[in-house]
Amino acid sequence: MEPQKFGEAPVAMDMPPKVKKGKKPSRKIRALLALIIPIVIWLCLFLVFPYLNLFSYSFWKAGPFDVIKEFNLGNYQKFFSSEHSADPTFFVLLDTLKLALIVTFFTIILSFPLAYFICFKVKRFKQSLYILVIIPLWISYIVRAYSWKIILGSNGILNSFLIWLGVTDQPLDFLLYSQVSVTIAMIHIYLPFVLMPIYTSLEQIPRTLMEASKDLGGNRLKTFWKVVFPLSLPGVISGGTFAFVLSMGDFLAPTLLGGSSSSTMIANIVQQQFGTSNNWPYGAAIGVIILIIVLIVLKVTGSAEKRYSNLDSV
């Protein structure tokens, strides 16, 4: 650098550029991460990893004493070939699907009038009656299922009442330890799960729409079919999905009230494979198949619910 001459203006020296320090995340971002990270960890530990483990098990095979970690499709071949073999698993799945549809249908049929009555006909004790309907959810599942043994048994309340009326001379044996008892118990147990979303949908219907329908000459029946029912369909679909999915995975009701091969459900087969049969890979394969069916149902019902939810904006 040349020395500065006398009388010349001082020359500005080039300063090195300032290094910008990285900005620290704002307080909002840190608070958001503090909320999201625990949720992600929880989902990974209790949802993602278990399902990945189930999926990997389904491609292994059971050995004499332990699981052999060799990739094969034998478990899935065994399941889908059970239609033509002595293994009843495929037919049990079909029976489970049929029973789940029956339970879903009757829970909707019974829940809708009750939810409609509480929502539109009860004025003073609406909340009290609603709480009374969902109180069974606070009672143990086993207690609710076992109570039907007392009601449907040979010396139970229903048979004693029918004999007293003179309808029959002896107890009706088909009421207990059959598919009838399993179906009745499951309808009773899952009824609150269907009623709650239906009631919520009915409560959200603007009363002005119903009044407008009446002003335009619509009677009660026409108002119901043209206004109330279409706007309540999201709740009906949501409740029906609850009933179907829960019915697909139920194994306690068939165990306590079934007592025969005709009332065995697919969840009982899975329980048996992980229990007495000690064939975890085959049980995992059945679990994956059930999971795929449930995901398909959730996709279809979710699309339908979204479609009918758009009616609110029409």
PLM feature spans:
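N-terminal signal-anchor/first transmembrane alpha helix
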Residues: 1-53, 117, 127-133
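Transmembrane alpha-helices
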Residues: 37, 41, 45-47, 135, ...
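Short membrane-interfacial helix/loop motifs at transmembrane-helix boundaries
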Residues: 47-87, 151, 155-156, 258-261, ...
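Non-cytoplasmic
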Residues: 50-57, 145, 150, 194-197, ...
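Membrane-interfacial helix termini and adjacent extracytoplasmic/periplasmic loops
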Residues: 73, 145-187, 221, 254-262
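Transmembrane alpha-helix signature in integral membrane proteins
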Residues: 86-120
